[in-house]
């Protein structure tokens, strides 16, 4: 990903302005502020998630806002869930990566809560190539029929594509993943839990 595309930044228009903000319409601008913000977005697009190093924080959808301040930049992040053990490492990675932009302030915004729907299409494909089955869509706010026996969504194997898979454990190497096995190719894999 070279620069953030408008699809990554469309939600910015709904946020309250705090300072100079990069928006989808600013990406082509050449003034110093927008150029700095575009450069900062470019840097952030290469900061990898410490628990899933196949995707960047931008692709994961946890970078919510980027604002130019008087002496640097402010980055607003939404953690994947409250209590995520990688939060401090993520904050430090962001500070280190953006240090050339001056003072880096990292703010955690927990509302609205992060959802796997915020993972970009490119991020989902990178998860798949890394061997992690990406999450399906979350239909927040839509009613779900109550069933006595819960039917599981068919999870496609990231290696062979078969949906003939079985869950081995609700818990994988991190709290946001579960462990599966493909019955077709017999390979184990992790599935990023939809939130």
Question: Residues of each region from the PLM?
Answer:
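Domain-level signature for proteins that mediate thiol-based redox and metal-cofactor handling
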Residues: 1-195
């Amino acid at each position: 990903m070279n620069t953030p595309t408008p699809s990554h930044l469309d939600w910015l228009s709904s946020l309250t302005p705090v300072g100079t903000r990069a928006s989808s319409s600013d990406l082509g601008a050449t003034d110093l502020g927008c150029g700095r913000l575009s450069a900062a977005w470019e840097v952030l697009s290469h900061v990898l998630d410490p628990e899933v190093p196949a995707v960047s924080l931008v692709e994961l959808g946890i970078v919510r806002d980027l604002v130019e301040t008087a002496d640097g930049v402010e980055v607003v992040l939404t953690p994947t869930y409250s209590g995520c053990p990688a939060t401090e490492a993520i904050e430090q990675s962001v500070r280190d990566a953006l240090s050339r932009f001056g003072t880096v302030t990292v703010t955690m915004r927990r509302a609205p809560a992060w959802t796997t729907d915020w993972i970009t299409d490119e991020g989902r494909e990178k998860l798949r190539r890394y061997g992690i089955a990406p999450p399906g869509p979350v239909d927040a706010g839509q009613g779900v029929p109550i069933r006595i026996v819960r039917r599981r969504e068919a999870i496609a194997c990231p290696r062979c594509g078969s949906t003939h898979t079985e869950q081995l454990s609700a818990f994988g190497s991190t709290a946001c993943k579960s462990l599966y096995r493909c019955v077709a190719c017999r390979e184990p894999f992790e599935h990023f839990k939809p939130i």
